[in-house]
Amino acid sequence: MEEELMSLIKVWVYAIISISYCYYTSTRIKSGVFRLLSVLPVCVLFLVLPLFVSSVHFSGSTAFFLSWLANFKLILFSFDQGPLFPVPSNLSRFVCFTCFPIKLQQNPKPQNQMPKWGFAVKLAFFGVLLHMYEYKQHMSPTVLLVLYSLHIYLEYEILLAPLKVLLSISLWCDLEPHFNEPYLSTSLQDFWGRRWNLMVPAILRPAVYLPVRQMAGRKMNSDQALFLGVFASFLVSGVVHELIFFYFTRESPTGEVTLFFVLHGVCTAAECAAKRTRLVRRWKVSQMVSRLLTVGFVVMTGGWLFFPHLARSGMIERLADEAFLFIGFVKHKFFYLCRNQSLKS
């Protein structure tokens, strides 16, 4: 564990040095092709850095933070767009807004979130889920699918929520939440656009959706341009997920996760088009039914296309094993420090 932590520290030292170069050099170059050329070496480096750590958590988070989000942010920054425009006021802010999945909250709203103990409940529930892997061989495929889905969601939220709080305090600013109770989604558009991993649509919208829709709008009607913009966003998301799965498994991509996002892109675009018709506007469905249909569709298609590659490669079990290992590592260090403190006193 300690050797892997040292590798992670080295990776992030390289990342911070590279982003510092962008802050001091690329910001002085006029936006456009030349600024893009100045950040491209950093983007290439960010594609390589996750390969220097072997832990599933470390390689996955580094790939998500740097290879995906940071690269997209730097490309958008090259054209004075995205979260890095206007340029943050100092280096530390520039590094944080580039490296981490955070976005400044433009119009802070009154807090309407679950109580503070909600995070503790999710943390405790996640601990129960980890122990359920000991009985995996006795579970039906349906129960396993629910277990995998809850594991991915809770692990994401448990890792990202404290990071948001820490950075919000450090930077003295309000930051957008990463999740908005996705299990309450009433449609695919609601799930992907307003509730699940919100930093991703915040990046894909200016980077993919708007440019594609604008270009398509010159030769297509508005509905067709919208469909193409949504489809392109999901296609790009699928390709990037294939890359992240490669960092996870170090195996050749299978295309399954890309098909998962292509399917959801088509269904989300069709849903958006259907909502504009009179029939659907008049057809009222209860929120409970909408939530069951939406979450059920996401989970079932995930079991068909998203999870199989991870399950075959044993990555989900490795995530659980590493979580147990990390908890044990923290306990060991905690008791070691307490013992040393008692000996000194």
From Swiss-Prot:
The residues forming the signal peptide are: none
Its EC number is 2.3.1.75
> What is a biological process (GO) this protein takes part in?
lipid metabolic process
Please tell me where this protein is predominantly located: membrane
Q: Name one Pfam family in it.
A: MBOAT_2
Q: Localized where? A: Membrane
List all membrane-crossing ranges: 5-25, 36-56, 114-134, 143-163, 226-246, 254-274, 288-308
| Superkingdom assignment | Eukaryota
Q: Which residues form a coiled coil?
A: none
Task of the protein: Catalyzes the final step in the synthesis of long-chain linear esters (waxes).
The Swiss-Prot or TrEMBL record describes its family as follows: Belongs to the wax synthase family.
By what name is this protein known? Answer: Probable long-chain-alcohol O-fatty-acyltransferase 4
Q: Which gene encodes it?
A: AT4
